Regions:
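Glycine-centered loop/turn motifs
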Residues: 66, 70-72, 182-186, 333
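Charged- and aromatic-enriched interaction segments used to assemble
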Residues: 93-96, 102-242
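Acidic, small/polar-enriched beta strand-loop surface segments
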Residues: 2-22, 118, 126, 130, ...
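Short beta-strand and beta-hairpin "edge-sheet" elements
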Residues: 28, 74-102, 205-207, 337-370
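Oligomerization/assembly interface segments of phage tail-like spikes and tubes
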Residues: 36-57, 95-107, 251, 305-322, ...
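A mature extracytoplasmic/lumenal domain signature
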Residues: 52, 103-105, 208, 255, ...
Length: 383
């Protein structure tokens, strides 16, 4: 059985862009602190601090040459690569170097889309065909990184070979073009993912150099781990909160001042237990069909019915070293079951892992996690 354990050593390596050719590796004794995280539908960060007095003259000289985006930071927990991404900022004081970096999705935030966004074709040979939203996301990334007028070289961030997909069972149609159908949406690729594809059911995260394009997990997916209260070091709180509960989710593009020609999408099942409990989402996005609105409603339904019970882990607490889960299994988005025996709520239910926050110093390692309610698999047909 896998256990979290306690890291015996952390190691940081500065690589050239692409993450494979080493530039510098501070000695373990010079590395005084490491923080890194993993998150879902956002860009994670890492920070290392190096004591100049223990780094040596040669290492110090190389550290002085570290350049944002020309170099990348790689973090190893014992021998396992746990985090990697481009350097964002280097700060030097009299006694230490601090290097801040962001994960590989930062490259997508720095690359502007130069391709038409019209995924309506039913021909599988057409790269821009109707398909799972995860496939559409990968195609958008691939078409922008493979080359083109403004590319310094094909796949210059070295991302395409590290994309992993977990496709949805429902096909999506996606279009973001002007009235002439030949206009390109000039925005960063990451904005396309966040503003258009995540609401339609995309869920992305990074592990090491890998970019995972997945879907929200449900109770139908297998659990990566099963935890109890003994798996946590410190206090925990159970919160049953109806603020975001719903048996039906509605999405509309209706304007308060003019409702002519508006459409809506609805997802869910009226509950005999809660009755009809609605949640309304308004979108100002243009050109959305009823199917598009249904996609957004479907993606937003997860975790609302039944009323979610959250597991809160106060700041400073984290997983115990005996927790039956490995760092490799702590991938944001996966299902993790928790049994809170001994609590009045008698909680035993599945969750989704939303964040992993790790801090290492000479005093030891702390691994914090955030767990959010998970939804049942959707049952129903599109409009």
């Amino acid at each position: 059985m896998a256990v979290l354990g306690c890291a015996q050593e952390y190691r940081a390596v500065i690589h050239w862009r692409g993450g494979s050719l080493p530039f510098n590796s501070p000695t373990v004794s010079a590395l005084t602190s490491v923080t890194w995280n993993r998150t879902v539908n956002d860009t994670s960060e890492a920070v290392i601090t190096i004591a100049k007095g223990m780094a040596g003259a040669d290492c110090c000289e190389q550290l002085g040459q570290v350049e944002p985006f020309a170099h990348e930071l790689s973090i190893y927990r014992d021998s396992e690569l746990v985090w990697q991404g481009p350097v964002l900022r280097v700060t030097e004081s009299r006694t230490r170097f601090t290097i801040e970096a962001r994960d590989v999705t930062e490259w997508l935030a720095r690359i502007v889309n130069t391709n038409l966004l019209r995924y309506l074709s039913t021909n599988p040979a057409d790269p821009r065909h109707v398909g799972p939203i995860q496939e559409i996301a990968e195609t958008i990334i691939r078409l922008n990184l493979e080359g083109g007028l403004y590319a310094s070289s094909p796949d210059w961030p070295r991302m395409l070979n590290y994309i992993v997909r977990d496709d949805d069972s429902v096909d999506a149609r996606f279009e973001k073009d002007g009235t002439a159908d030949n206009e390109i949406w000039i925005v960063p690729i990451l904005q396309i993912l966040n503003d258009e594809l995540v609401p339609r059911g995309l869920e992305y995260t990074t592990v090491g150099r890998g970019l995972i394009l997945g879907r929200p997990q449900t109770t139908a997916d297998p659990a990566q781990a099963r935890l109890t209260l003994d798996s946590f070091a410190g206090d925990v709180e159970l919160v049953r909160d109806g603020t975001n509960a719903a048996s039906l989710v509605w999405v509309t593009n209706q304007d308060d001042h003019d409702i002519t020609g508006s459409q809506y999408g609805v997802s869910g099942v009226v509950s005999g237990y809660y009755g009809r409990l609605d949640h309304l989402i308004r979108t100002q996005a243009e050109g959305l069909s009823a199917y598009d609105l249904w996609q957004i409603a479907r993606a937003s339904y997860a975790g609302r019915n039944p009323v979610p019970t959250s597991l809160r882990i106060p700041e400073g607490a984290g997983l115990a070293t005996t927790a039956p889960v490995s760092i490799r299994q702590l991938v944001p988005g996966v299902r993790i079951d928790v049994a809170a025996t001994g609590m009045c709520m008698g909680l035993s239910q599945p969750y989704r892992l939303s964040d992993v926050d790790v801090e290492w110093r000479a005093s030891g390692e702390r691994v914090g996690v955030s767990l959010v309610p998970i939804g049942d698999p959707f049952v129903g047909d599109p409009p």
